[in-house]
Amino acid sequence: MKIRNSLKSLLGRHRDNRLVRRKGRIYIINKTQKRYKARQG
């Protein structure tokens, strides 16, 4: 999982990326390509 300050650029890297809020953190998850997983930090 990548930890990035800004997720906006990562969101457009794959069409299946989803922006999700969990426990006050913002995540990008991707069911088809797991390598695009990221967290804002």
Curated annotation (Swiss-Prot):
SUPFAM superfamilies: Ribosomal protein L36 (SSF57840)
One Gene Ontology term from the biological process aspect of the record: translation
Species annotation: Azorhizobium caulinodans (strain ATCC 43989 / DSM 5975 / JCM 20966 / LMG 6465 / NBRC 14845 / NCIMB 13405 / ORS 571)
A Pfam short name: Ribosomal_L36
Gene name of the encoded protein: rpmJ
GO molecular function annotation: structural constituent of ribosome
Entry keyword set: Ribonucleoprotein, Ribosomal protein
Gene Ontology CC: ribonucleoprotein complex; ribosome
HAMAP family: Ribosomal_bL36
Family note: Belongs to the bacterial ribosomal protein bL36 family.
Name of the protein in question: Large ribosomal subunit protein bL36
